[in-house]
Amino acid sequence: MVPTTPLFDPEEYFSREGDASLTTAITVTAVFWIAMVAYMSIYMWYLFDVATELPEASLGGIIPLTALLMGLTVLLIWLLITTILHGITRVAGGSGSLKTTFEIAAWGLGAYAIAVFAQAATTPFTVPSESITAEDPADIAVQFAAEAPLSIAIITLLTLAVATVWAVYIWTYSMAQTHDISVRRAAAASIIAAVFVPLVLGVF
């Protein structure tokens, strides 16, 4: 039986007949966007709650801007990953359609979405026990992060590492199956693509 997603068996999933689905790709990417917005909204809610010197601002007004920024960020990440996967496999002699690469790239983001949801769930446990009195929003964010328990920081890093390995696995075996390329070369392209995810997220 063909699996309904490539999260656990990408080779079998992409061995099915039929064209890739841009609708599926957009849906999975949207889930990643929702995860990002949820995490940032929860993070800012707690940040506003403990920061006593923040300028008066409406959290309800900031969240829509955050959703827009996250939407642009997710779109950029998706396009970058697709470009890297497709470009490198083409240079390495692979075939396969760009449409298929878009779907494959999106499913990797699905793995990251699970990690982001997990990070959102741990945010309440990172809240400082005392109020933060800094006035600069950047300093407030630094203090907020510094107060997080070491165990939570370790869990966050491990979750990101697992999501990255999972995404590389999905991209590698999906590209090898659909683009007529060796697993080794597909893995090289996937690892390069995975490097860009935390880099882009760090910029934003």
Range-by-range predicted roles:
Residues 4, 81-106, 172, 179:
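Membrane-interface segments at transmembrane-helix boundaries
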Residues 14-32, 99-109, 184-191:
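Alpha-helical transmembrane segments and their helix-start/interface "positive-inside/aromatic belt" motifs
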Residues 63-86, 113, 120-193:
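Selective recognition of hydrophobic, aromatic-rich stretches within alpha-helical transmembrane segments
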